[in-house]
A protein has these predicted regions:
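Ligand-binding pockets and gating/stacking loops
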Residues: 1-185
């Protein structure tokens, strides 16, 4: 668009004052930047997906029962890594479960939901289970970060170096619904 009209623009600029030329330059720069972004987006749509290794394909091609929380979490994290690796997306969100319905983790002996455990009332058994639950969740997140570090992007660099990741909770102290000083990594 800009190139097709550049001669006409240059003729107009000869009649403009300094301030108007500055505004015109800002406008033309904005148009050029929009053209570049549009061209880049069009090119991206036609870019074939890269090949993935058989080990990555097997890692993400499995039926996972939510009762096996570790397998479930790692599968979702693997899918996120694969999406970043192949540049299918640059944004992903994963909730381990809502504050009110995060599921039990029977594989480590936790039959209560996280929400139920957070209302521990000072019960040491519940508090220990809550600690174990959170430890388990952060171990799964650590798995995700490790996968980002060991997986290369399209330029051959670790994905972790070009990824911003946030892990946290909407409650700092669930027993009283405290939401100040939220625990975030």
């Amino acid at each position: 668009v800009l190139d097709d009209n550049l001669d006409e623009v240059r003729q107009m600029e000869k009649k403009m004052g300094t301030a108007d030329k500055g505004r015109m330059d800002q406008y033309l720069t904005s148009v050029r930047e929009a053209e570049i972004r549009t061209r880049r987006a069009d090119d991206w749509l036609d870019t074939p997906l890269p090949q993935i290794s058989d080990s990555d394909r097997k890692r993400t091609n499995r039926k996972v029962n939510k009762a096996q929380a570790g397998d479930y979490f790692r599968t979702v994290y693997d899918l996120m890594v694969l999406a970043f690796q192949t540049d299918v997306t640059r944004v992903a969100t994963f909730s381990l479960g809502g504050e009110g319905d995060a599921f039990a983790i029977p594989e480590i002996g936790i039959t209560e939901s996280r929400h139920q455990l957070s209302h521990h009332g000072g019960d040491e058994g519940y508090m220990e289970k809550l600690t174990n639950y959170d430890t388990f969740a952060i171990e799964q997140y650590s798995y995700f970060l490790s996968r980002l570090e060991e997986t290369k992007d399209l330029n051959g660099k670790p994905l972790l170096g070009s990824t911003m990741s946030l892990f946290g909770s909407g409650m700092s102290y669930g027993h009283s619904h405290g939401n100040a000083n939220l625990p975030l990594v």
